[in-house]
C-alpha cells in the first residue's frame, strides 16, 4: 500500500474567497482520505500479524476447524465451516460483546480480506451474518469444539514457552471459578437456575439465569486461558446454589482428568471449594490444591490455625516494592484424611487478611511465592469485574 500527498499551489488566496473555500474542501478530503488509509493499513498489518501468530503457535487450527462435522445440507452451504468458526473466534479475541455487533464491526473490506487470508479462502467477498453463525453453532456437537481447545492447549504446553509459570517448577495452575451467563424473567429450560426477588410480596418474581464453572489455565500473570466449561444445573428447589456449583466443579474435574490424564495440576479457587470431598477428589487424581479460605468454610480448621500459629511462630514482615506485608503460616493441620497447611498475608496498614489452604508443604523460603500464586485467582476475578 502506497500513500501519495496531493500538492495544492495557492496564489493570492486572500482575495479569492471561492477559491479559498475550494482549497479548504480539498484539504479536508485529503485529511480524511489519509486518515482512512492509515486506519486501513493499521488494520491490515494487525491482520497479518494475527495470521503469523496463529500459524506459528497453532498450525493445525485451520485443518481442525475444517474437520468439524458439518450438519448442513451441501446445497445450502455458502460459507465453509472454517470461516464461520474463525469469525466467531476473532469476535472473542477482539472482545466484541455480541454476534450482532460483530457483523457491524467486521463489515469492512480489510477484515474480510484478512479472514479470507486466515482461512485460505481467496474468493471470500462477504462475511457470514450473525444469525447464520448462531444457527450453525446450534447444530454442531460442542464436544468437537472442546476437543480442538484441548489440542491447542496441549500444543501450548509442549512448546515449553510458559514453563516459568508453573507452581514450584512442576504444577500447572488451573483456576476454577463460577460465572453467571445472562438472565431473564422467562424460564429458558428446566436446567436454568433461578433467584426469587421480593419474596413474600406482591412484587415477587423469579429471575432465571445460567451459571457455569470454568477451568482457566494460568500461562502468565496477564495470560489466563479458559480451557473447559461445565454448566451448573438445577438439581431441585431444596438444593442450594453452592452445592450445585460444587457438583458442577466435580464433573469438571472428571473431564479435566480425562482430557489431561498425566498433566501435573494445582487447582486454585475460592473458599466455596474448601470441603472434604474436594480434598479427596484432588488426592484421588494426584493433583494439588491451593484455595482461598474463610472462617465459615471449615470452622474447626480456622480454630486450629488460630491456636497453632502462636505456638509455631512463623510470622514475619517483609517489604516488597512499595508495599510491606505480613506473612504467617501453620503446618500439619489434620482434617479427616488430609494434612493441610494454611498461609496468611496482610498488607501493612490494611485490616483485611488473605488466608489460603493447601496440601503443599510450606516453609519460610516458599510462602511468598505460594501466596502470590493463590492471589492470581482473586486478581483474575477482579480484572473481569
What is the meaning of each model-derived region?
Residues 1-59:
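Charged, often Cys/His-bearing segments associated with DNA-binding zinc-finger transcription factors
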Residues 51-86, 131-134:
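Basic, short loop/linker segments at the boundary and entry of helix-turn-helix/winged-helix-like folds
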Residues 53-54, 102, 364-385:
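Short amphipathic alpha-helical "interface-anchor" segments enriched in bulky aromatics
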Residues 134-221:
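Active-site-proximal, Lys/Arg-enriched surface segment
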Residues 76-151, 155, 219, 275, ...:
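Short, positively charged, Gly/Tyr-enriched micro-motifs
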Residues 87, 102-103, 129, 133, ...:
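Short, conserved catalytic/metal-binding motifs centered on acidic residues
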Residues 234-343:
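An internal, acidic/charged active-site-proximal segment
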Residues 198-264:
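Electropositive, glycine- and tryptophan-enriched low-complexity nucleic-acid-binding patches
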Amino acid at each position: 500500500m502506497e500513500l501519495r500527498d496531493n500538492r495544492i499551489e495557492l496564489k493570492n488566496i486572500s482575495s479569492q474567497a471561492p477559491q479559498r473555500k475550494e482549497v479548504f474542501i480539498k484539504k479536508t478530503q485529503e485529511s480524511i482520505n489519509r486518515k482512512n488509509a492509515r486506519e486501513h493499513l493499521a488494520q491490515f498489518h494487525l491482520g497479518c500479524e494475527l495470521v503469523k501468530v496463529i500459524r506459528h503457535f497453532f498450525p493445525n487450527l485451520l485443518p481442525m476447524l475444517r474437520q468439524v462435522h458439518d450438519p448442513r445440507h451441501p446445497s445450502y452451504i455458502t460459507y465453509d465451516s472454517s470461516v464461520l468458526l474463525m469469525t466467531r473466534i476473532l469476535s472473542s479475541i477482539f472482545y466484541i460483546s455480541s454476534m450482532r455487533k460483530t457483523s457491524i464491526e467486521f463489515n469492512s473490506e480489510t477484515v474480510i480480506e484478512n479472514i479470507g487470508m486466515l482461512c485460505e479462502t481467496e474468493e471470500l467477498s462477504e462475511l457470514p451474518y450473525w444469525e447464520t453463525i448462531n444457527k450453525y453453532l446450534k447444530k454442531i456437537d460442542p464436544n468437537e469444539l472442546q476437543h480442538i481447545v484441548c489440542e491447542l492447549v496441549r500444543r501450548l504446553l509442549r512448546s515449553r514457552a510458559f514453563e516459568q509459570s508453573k507452581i514450584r517448577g512442576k504444577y500447572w495452575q488451573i483456576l476454577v471459578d463460577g460465572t453467571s451467563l445472562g438472565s431473564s424473567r422467562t424460564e429458558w429450560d428446566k436446567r436454568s437456575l433461578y433467584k426469587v426477588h421480593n419474596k413474600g410480596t406482591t412484587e415477587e418474581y423469579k429471575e432465571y439465569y445460567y451459571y457455569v464453572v470454568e477451568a482457566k489455565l494460568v500461562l502468565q500473570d496477564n495470560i489466563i486461558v479458559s480451557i473447559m466449561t461445565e454448566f451448573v444445573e438445577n438439581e431441585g428447589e431444596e438444593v442450594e446454589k453452592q452445592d450445585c456449583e460444587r457438583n458442577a466443579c466435580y464433573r469438571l474435574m472428571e473431564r479435566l482428568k480425562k482430557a489431561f490424564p498425566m498433566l501435573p495440576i494445582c487447582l486454585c479457587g475460592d473458599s466455596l471449594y474448601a470441603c472434604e470431598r474436594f480434598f479427596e477428589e484432588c488426592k484421588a487424581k494426584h493433583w494439588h490444591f491451593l484455595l482461598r479460605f474463610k472462617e465459615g468454610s471449615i470452622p474447626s480448621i480456622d480454630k486450629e490455625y488460630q491456636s497453632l500459629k502462636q505456638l509455631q511462630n512463623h510470622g514475619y514482615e517483609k517489604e516488597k516494592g512499595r508495599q510491606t506485608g505480613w506473612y504467617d503460616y501453620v503446618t500439619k493441620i489434620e482434617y479427616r484424611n488430609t494434612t493441610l497447611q494454611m498461609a496468611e498475608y496482610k498488607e501493612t496498614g490494611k485490616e483485611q487478611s488473605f488466608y489460603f489452604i493447601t496440601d503443599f508443604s510450606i516453609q519460610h523460603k516458599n510462602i511468598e511465592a505460594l501466596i502470590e500464586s493463590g492471589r492470581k485467582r482473586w486478581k483474575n476475578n477482579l480484572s473481569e469485574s
